[in-house]
């Protein structure tokens, strides 16, 4: 694989990042949104495991490094404008199916109902017991 060539085809933002959506391969559920830099995307392709870039920590974030909730990557796709990446993943871990740091399946658990945001998906595991 010509690493430089395929990475150069993305439209990186001014900070050298690209937005990434993680989607559960089996169900199509959108699990989370994160960012990647070149190194994170190259590592993800190399390892077959999601590696993101943490803007708050300023470093690579190997999904599941603290929680054990790893994402096995089956497919990496680029949108038509070459500025958004889609990962099709299987969410693995001690409690398979937890992608969100809140202990939920998806980070998109709030729904707008009657003019207010309501949590509509259950907490599968207390986050305090995940992050010790």
Swiss-Prot record:
Pfam families: PRA-CH (PF01502). Its main location: cytoplasm. InterPro entries: PRA-CH (IPR026660), PRib_AMP_CycHydrolase_dom (IPR002496), PRib_AMP_CycHydrolase_sf (IPR038019). Binds 1 Mg(2+) ion per subunit. GO terms for molecular function: magnesium ion binding; phosphoribosyl-AMP cyclohydrolase activity; zinc ion binding. GO terms for cellular component: cytoplasm. Keywords: Amino-acid biosynthesis, Cytoplasm, Histidine biosynthesis, Hydrolase, Magnesium, Metal-binding, Zinc. Its EC number is 3.5.4.19. Catalyzes the hydrolysis of the adenine ring of phosphoribosyl-AMP. This is Phosphoribosyl-AMP cyclohydrolase.
